[in-house]
């Protein structure tokens, strides 16, 4: 190295356009001794201080009035630990030199990150509080392989990109820098000069905390500690366990009445946990809580995948929120969106001037329905970013399951595209092979590294093997939403009862494919928005019939094979559509004897009944666990089926979807005995007409429906009853 760097290099360094700052700045061993260079704009005087003894060794010479300093130590040949004593305006300040520290990434991390198989990329990329060579500070690392220069900017350096340019690791395109003295809570971003020479200010893709919109900076935040799973939580996710999910949007479940402001994570932990437990749900599912810029996206257009949104508090608050559910014996599911991201300038879009995280061709990389960008699943680093994020939420916050949004839009290249608007895969097909490989890898990794944690697919097509293991050609999900069942049964329920006999098969068709996947029956947020009306408002008839229809439908659903999901507000029959900008209509429950309270009591009892009786859940995915008893009585719109568990216990569900009571209705049954009526949706307790079977009934040795025994029943109008065979 020459005594004085080339003037052009100094100009580039000062102007923030030099891509290799470590080759100039810091201490370097030369043939003429040690050379120390520093770029300290606005500094009046700089001294080199030996850390070991605090002695001032030499004063650096100001070679350029814009802040470039240099010193030459001809008598010393070996590098040593040092600091700078800098005088800015008046008093001197002792500072560490970021450019005296060596490379941060280990070779194994560099290899795994480039390969896309690093299990925990969030432990290496992003911003991490640490101590290096006895000095406290923060290590920064960001992937931007096509950038000309990347700097860390923040409150600590006046957002000046000249002050802290980063080191490029050319083997993987990662820029890194350790900044001494930086503390938790400080704001930062990455200032990038992209491949076109344009300056971009980007939030950290791996930030653990971020500012709330409309601000866009990242915050220095410690990596959350590992949360271990438990045998009870793992068992609660099992295919043979009762799974009843309460789907919640945290920003509108309940709000402060005085200013309509959100409840915090801590406030929700006190109120929501108690309510979910009271209602008997086994799981709570949260609409996405990743940081997102637009409230109206409900979280489904996230930019800060690793940061819980600041709308409701800090990462520590969210972690305490999850822990409170676990203490109550309730598992937590997180809606996760690896399918697309918004094009906001501070986010992932054209991160280093190229289509880095997204596909370059808009026929692959632009989602025209949502005006968002689609991740490039063919890039190792992008797959690693996403797969690592899935594991992050489970390992660091104790999330028990992920529900993956819009899987169909990921696995089909022609999703919502006309002919000529999409690019076929390598073999000329419509499947996105890279996305399929990503989903298989992620699901398999979670299964191996986080046993008992599960994934759930919102997949709206008939793509085969969604819940089959990747090793035999499946996608590897544990559960799949049954969108077909939901649409068919809601269409049936919307029919006037007099016309239902013409649509009888809508309620039975789901059993023809019920065992092709591990299905969840969802009545989700998507069914109570965009003019679809509330579930209650879709029911036909006058007010009494609407509520009776809804109660009968819920009871039919809870008895049907498949796990259950219900969106908030539906449990007490909210009459209007969901509005994310205001609280649910809790005032509807003010009348304890009102219809809304009746529906709420029914859902609570359905959950407790569901959890109490194993026939309702244990063999959800075994054909032996279900038997039609009455499947073809379309004239009376009656359905009857039997649920069975592994020990032979049996429960019969019978639904009458007309307002006409059916007296002396005979149903054939496999085994005779006494059958106790354990639930009746027409009970007066639920504001029904209180017609039923006086608590139970004995079977008759009368052949019916191909069985030697039968029950002679009273079927209430627009109602479902459960009958449990007692040994």
Curated annotation (Swiss-Prot):
EC number(s) stated in the UniProt entry for this protein: 2.4.1.18
Catalytic residues in the record: 405 (nucleophile), 458 (proton donor)
Sample GO molecular function, one term: 1,4-alpha-glucan branching enzyme activity
Catalytic activity: Transfers a segment of a (1->4)-alpha-D-glucan chain to a primary hydroxy group in a similar glucan chain
InterPro entries recorded: A-amylase/branching_C (IPR006048), Branching_enzy (IPR037439), GlgB (IPR006407), GlgB_N (IPR054169), GlgB_N_E_set_prok (IPR044143), Glyco_hydro_13_cat_dom (IPR006047), Glyco_hydro_13_N (IPR004193), Glyco_hydro_b (IPR013780)
Keywords, alphabetical: Carbohydrate metabolism, Glycogen biosynthesis, Glycogen metabolism, Glycosyltransferase, Transferase
Superkingdom of the organism of origin: Bacteria
Example GO BP: glycogen biosynthetic process
Entry GO CC: cytosol
Pathway: Glycan biosynthesis; glycogen biosynthesis
Keyword Transferase in record: yes
Pfam families on file: Alpha-amylase (PF00128), Alpha-amylase_C (PF02806), CBM_48 (PF02922), GlgB_N (PF22019)
Annotated function: Catalyzes the formation of the alpha-1,6-glucosidic linkages in glycogen by scission of a 1,4-alpha-linked oligosaccharide from growing alpha-1,4-glucan chains and the subsequent attachment of the oligosaccharide to the alpha-1,6 position.
Protein family according to the UniProt entry: Belongs to the glycosyl hydrolase 13 family. GlgB subfamily.
Subunit composition and interactions: Monomer.
Record's protein name: 1,4-alpha-glucan branching enzyme GlgB
């Amino acid at each position: 190295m020459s005594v004085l760097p080339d003037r052009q290099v100094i100009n580039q360094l000062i102007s923030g356009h030099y891509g290799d700052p470590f080759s100039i700045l810091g201490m370097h061993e030369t043939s003429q001794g040690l050379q120390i260079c520093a770029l300290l704009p606005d500094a009046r005087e700089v001294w080199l201080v030996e850390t070991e003894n605090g002695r001032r060794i030499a004063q650096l010479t100001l070679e350029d009035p814009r802040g470039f300093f240099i010193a030459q130590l001809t008598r010393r040949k070996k590098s040593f630990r040092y600091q700078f004593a800098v005088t800015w305006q008046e008093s001197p300040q002792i500072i560490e030199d970021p450019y005296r520290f060596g490379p941060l990434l280990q070779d194994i991390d560099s290899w795994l990150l480039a390969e896309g198989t690093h299990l925990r990329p969030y432990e290496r990329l992003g911003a991490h509080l640490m101590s290096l060579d006895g000095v406290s500070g923060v290590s920064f690392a960001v992937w931007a392989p096509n950038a000309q220069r990347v700097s860390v900017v923040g409150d600590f350096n006046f957002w000046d990109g000249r002050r802290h340019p980063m080191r490029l690791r050319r083997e993987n395109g990662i820029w890194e820098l350790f900044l001494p003295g930086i503390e938790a809570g400080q704001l930062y971003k990455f200032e990038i000069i992209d491949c076109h020479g344009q300056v971009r200010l980007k939030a950290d893709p791996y930030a653990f905390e971020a500012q709330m919109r409309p601000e866009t900076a990242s915050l220095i935040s410690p990596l959350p500690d590992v949360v271990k799973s438990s045998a009870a939580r793992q068992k609660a996710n099992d295919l043979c366990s009762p799974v009843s999910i309460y789907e919640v949007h945290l920003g509108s479940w309940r709000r402060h009445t005085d200013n309509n402001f959100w409840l915090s994570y801590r406030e929700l932990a006190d109120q929501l946990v108690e309510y979910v437990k009271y209602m008997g749900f086994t799981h709570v599912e949260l609409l996405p809580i990743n940081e997102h810029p637009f409230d109206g996206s409900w979280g489904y257009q996230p930019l800060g995948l690793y940061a819980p949104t600041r709308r409701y508090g800090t990462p520590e608050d969210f972690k305490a929120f999850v822990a409170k559910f676990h203490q109550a014996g309730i598992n937590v599911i997180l809606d996760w969106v690896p399918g697309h991201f918004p094009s906001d300038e501070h986010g992932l879009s054209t991160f280093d001037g190229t289509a880095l995280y997204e596909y370059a061709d808009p026929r692959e990389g632009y989602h025209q329905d949502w005006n968002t960008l689609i991740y490039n699943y063919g890039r190792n680093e992008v797959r690693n970013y996403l797969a690592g994020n899935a594991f992050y939420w489970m390992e660091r916050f104790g999330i028990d399951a992920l529900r993956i949004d819009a899987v169909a839009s990921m696995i089909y290249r022609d999703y919502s595209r006309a002919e000529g608007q999409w690019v076929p895969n390598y073999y000329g097909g419509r499947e996105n092979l890279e996305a399929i490989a990503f989903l298989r890898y992620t699901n398999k990794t979670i299964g191996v590294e986080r046993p008992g944690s599960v994934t759930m697919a919102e997949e709206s097509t008939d793509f085969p093997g969604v819940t089959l293991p990747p090793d035999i050609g499946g996608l590897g999900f544990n559960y799949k939403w049954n969108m077909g069942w939901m649409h068919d049964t809601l269409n049936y329920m919307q029919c006037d009862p007099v016309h239902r006999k013409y649509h009888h098969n809508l309620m039975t068709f789901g059993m023809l494919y019920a065992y092709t996947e591990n299905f969840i029956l969802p009545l989700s947020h998507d069914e109570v928005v965009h003019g679809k009306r509330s579930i209650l408002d879709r029911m036909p008839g006058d007010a009494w019939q609407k509520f009776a229809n809804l109660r009968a439908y819920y009871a039919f659903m809870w008895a049907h094979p498949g796990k259950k999901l219900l969106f908030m507000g539906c449990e007490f029959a909210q009459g209007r559509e969901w509005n994310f900008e205001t609280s649910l209509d809790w005032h509807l429950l003010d009348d304890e004897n009102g219809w809304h309270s009746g529906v709420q009591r029914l859902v609570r009892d359905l959950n407790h009944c569901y959890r109490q009786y194993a026939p309702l859940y244990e063999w959800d995915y075994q054909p032996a666990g279900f038997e039609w008893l009455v499947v073809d009585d379309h004239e009376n719109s009656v359905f009857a089926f039997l649920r069975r568990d592994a020990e032979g216990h049996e429960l019969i569900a019978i639904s009458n979807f007309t307002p006409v009571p059916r007296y002396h209705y005979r149903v054939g049954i496999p085994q005779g005995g006494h059958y106790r009526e354990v639930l009746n949706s027409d009970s007066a307790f639920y504001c029904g007409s209180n017609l039923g079977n006086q608590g139970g009934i004995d079977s008759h040795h009368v052949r019916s429906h191909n069985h030697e025994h039968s029950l002679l029943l009273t079927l209430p109008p627009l109602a479902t009853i459960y009958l449990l065979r007692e040994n």
